Amino acid sequence: MAGRRFGWSRAALLQLILGVNLMVMPRTQARTLRFVTLLYRHGDRSPVKAYPKDPHQEDKWPQGFGQLTKEGMLQHWELGQALRQRYHGFLNTSYHRQEVYVRSTDFDRTLMSAEANLAGLFPPDGIQRFNPNISWQPIPVHTVPVAEDRLLKFPLGPCPRFEQLQNETRRMPEYQNESVQNAQFLDMVANETGLTDLSLETVWNVYDTLFCEQTHGLPLPPWASPQTMQRLSRLKDFSFRFLFGIYKQAEKARLQGGVLLAQIRKNLTLMATTSQLPKLLVYSAHDTTLVALHMALGVYNGEQAPYASCHMFELYQEDSGNFSVEMYFRNESHRAPWPLTLPGCSHRCPLQDFLRLTEPVVPKDWLQECQLAGGPADTEVIVALAVCGSILFLLIVLLLTVLFRVQAQPPGYRHVPDGEDHA
């Protein structure tokens, strides 16, 4: 009996210790991934154009200029596979149209990149296979005409205020110093390429062409030495900073990357309150799109976004019920994505803080903010006021004329009939 009583006491003591430990030990933070937005650059492509003296013209490229290559297709298929692994358990292993929405700019290379990416992300499984020998299924990619794209094709335009900011940027010391320091170099490149309108803002085209040719094993001309290529690469990165930074970066962001950021903020807020969007929203675009967004967010690393690089926005619901945003940038295929931290916030940024910190670079009315002081909108007001003023002036003149004539008639004057009847 004594042993039995001891056994019960030991069990009771164990329960007591476990109960105390459960109260003392902190609860594990349970987080739920609720929503993901991806923005990626297209994969490897042929050059957009050749320079006049280029020995490698468009006929050297199987599909012509600006087209996705087989290497680019593979890059995006591999990115799709990496995303499939990263979001395993969040996304269904097979494609469900209610879960995913993809939008691309209206360029062959971005549309095809999205399709290659989706092939890696959602290989058909079971009943989704329409042919047992084909491990692929069609998944919709949406787009709008380039002329109507006010979300993904940068720089956005026409925007008179942005053009004015660019003109003002050209007068900044940093831009002037670059112009002076590279004047002879640009003259040399212009002479070797046959280009007549080469500048700090257009020299990236030369680097892009040479880079594409070098990547695909085409011989470069003797003047395109490693030192020249390195210098061209630096000027290419400078051209991105000219577009979106150097001078009044926040205002430039409101007119450029802030437009896309506004849509991303709207989607994050909507998913935190109503869950009415797909779980995965994908944008397939360009290096300028990524740089514009990174400049608006204050996370730009100063370099061109490489092929198939991908910015990730992940919306989490914390154990407390509150929401937070985490950002990552995958710019290398052989390592995990880099965590990005919004200036002024932690990496795990509370949604309300994310919205507050990004508010200054989001336009309230893009069309209005694009107008110049005294621009078209103001001109319309001035014209309207001028018309109203002219009408008012004519009415006053007419009224004064009538009054003058009345006062000019002799006192007591009355019309006297002449006595004739007019039939």
Swiss-Prot record:
One of its GO terms (cellular component) is lysosomal lumen. Keywords: Disulfide bond, Glycoprotein, Hydrolase, Lysosome, Membrane, Signal, Transmembrane, Transmembrane helix. It holds the Pfam family His_Phos_2. GO terms for molecular function: acid phosphatase activity. The membrane-bound form is converted to the soluble form by sequential proteolytic processing. First, the C-terminal cytoplasmic tail is removed. Cleavage by a lysosomal protease releases the soluble form in the lysosome lumen. It is found in: Lysosome membrane; Lysosome lumen. It catalyses: a phosphate monoester + H2O = an alcohol + phosphate. Its EC number is 3.1.3.2. It is a single-pass membrane protein. The chain crosses the membrane at residues 381-401. Its main location: membrane. Glycans are attached at N92, N133, N167, N177, N191, N267, N322, N331. Residues 1-30 form the signal peptide. PROSITE patterns: HIS_ACID_PHOSPHAT_1, HIS_ACID_PHOSPHAT_2. Residues 402-423 are cytoplasmic. GO terms for biological process: lysosome organization. The active site is at H42 (nucleophile), D287 (proton donor). It comes from the Eukaryota. Disulfide bonds join C159-C370, C212-C310, C345-C349. Residues 31-380 are lumenal. Belongs to the histidine acid phosphatase family. This is Lysosomal acid phosphatase. It comes from Bos taurus (Bovine). The gene is ACP2.
